[in-house]
Amino acid sequence: MSFTRRHAIAAGVIGGVAVAAEPGKLSAQAAQKTFVLVHGAWHGGWCWRTVADLLEKQGHKVFAPTLTGLGERSHLIGPDVNVTTHIVDIENVIKWENLSDVVLVGHSYGGLVISGVAERVSDKISSIIFLDAFLPEDGDSLLEKSSPAFKAAIEAAIARKDISFKAPPAAAFGVAEKDQAWVNSKTTPQPIGTYAEKATYKGGRDKIARKAFIRAKGYASPTFDANVAKVKSNSGWKLVELETGHDVMVIAPDKLAALLIDLA
């Protein structure tokens, strides 16, 4: 599996959040963490570029893998690529890189993926963060959690035996006009098998000590709003609401990097 690994040591300020450290040294507050950042549908590890750079500059280790069939791995797309494929992608990064005390972050569709990873290697994860993401229960699928119009479009694609589903324009994710051309040039069709698979979730994420949900309030999603209500009713979770569009890592990377450090 290909992935981006970043590792650097520095000190400073991210998004207005001060890190009290002498130049070239890390404070106890900024003790090194290991972040695994999982992108959402149609995206790739590329979308985390700025956030990863900011985390590195604070001395953290960052992995931003691209899931099978997407981004620079789009040549591997096929009808058999599904949520389980992507769960194994991330599990293998953790396994082959000998990672532990991982801060596992999943954006959007990535919430299904990191929930599955937590079923397999919860002992390797110290914090799990859902960034404007799906928060599945056992037997849920991406298709069932989609809007009626989107669900109908996916079902039609499945009936045609398509192997992928085209990405929406970047504007739909709330990306600023100046960044839309870049995002549009990088997004790739989502493997169709990721929509209908009913994955197994048996409470693995509940075993993780620190759990957080970040809601991008500028993105309309009844499903994500329901996740907010679910998290609010559970004292074991932290909830943060941001006034941004869906692609937070592109729209507000400074703010997100600081927030991830705080939630880690």
Task: Describe each PLM feature range.
Residues 130-161, 165:
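Flexible "cap/lid" loop of the alpha/beta hydrolase fold
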Residues 103-137:
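Conserved hydrolase catalytic core segment
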Residues 33-72:
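Conserved HGGG/HGGXW glycine-rich cap/lid loop of the alpha/beta-hydrolase fold
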Residues 240-264:
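Catalytic active-site module of serine/aspartate enzymes centered on a nucleophile-bearing elbow/loop
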Residues 7-26:
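N-terminal export signals
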Residues 217-243, 250:
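Conserved loop-alpha-helix segment in the C-terminal half of the alpha/beta-hydrolase fold
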Residues 20-38:
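C-terminal segment of N-terminal export signals and the immediately downstream linker at the start
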Residues 67-102, 119-120, 145-146:
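Active-site loop/oxyanion-hole signature of alpha/beta-hydrolase fold enzymes
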